Amino acid sequence: MAHKKGTGSTRNGRDSNAKRLGVKCFGGELVHPGYILVRQRGTKFHPGVNVRRGGDDTLFAVATGIVTFERYGKWRKKVSVYPVEAAAQ
């Protein structure tokens, strides 16, 4: 039996940095090419019209227009950017 207490140890005490994921441009906003619309892991949102998906699944605009979030099938959602001229009509 030990007569000194000793220091003990733990394998906890770490935490990862927040990744700042989520929607960056909301529905109805005017965006330009290159604007980041959604930062995500996986495809919670799918790319729609004038939207492309980056290597880390980030969705970004490729045209100037208005952001819209739409249903895509029964369970999926997509993000589209419709040109301002088309949105005005």
Curated annotation (Swiss-Prot):
The family database entries (Gene3D superfamilies) matched by this protein are listed as:
2.40.50.100
Cite the GO molecular-function annotations of the record. structural constituent of ribosome
Please give the PROSITE patterns that the UniProt record associates with this protein: RIBOSOMAL_L27
Instruction: State a GO cellular component annotated for this protein.
Output: cytosolic large ribosomal subunit
Disulphide-bridged cysteine pairs: none
| Superkingdom classification of source | Bacteria
Keyword NADP assigned to the entry: answer is no
A Pfam family assignment: Ribosomal_L27
A GO BP entry is: translation
**Keyword Lipid biosynthesis assigned:** no
Sorted UniProt keywords: Ribonucleoprotein, Ribosomal protein
PANTHER family in alphabetical order? LARGE RIBOSOMAL SUBUNIT PROTEIN BL27M, RIBOSOMAL PROTEIN L27
Regarding protein family, the annotation reads: Belongs to the bacterial ribosomal protein bL27 family.
Q: What is this protein called?
A: Large ribosomal subunit protein bL27
What is the protein's species of origin?
Synechococcus sp. (strain JA-3-3Ab) (Cyanobacteria bacterium Yellowstone A-Prime)
Q: What is the lineage of its organism?
A: Bacteria, Bacillati, Cyanobacteriota, Cyanophyceae, Synechococcales
Q: Source gene?
A: rpmA
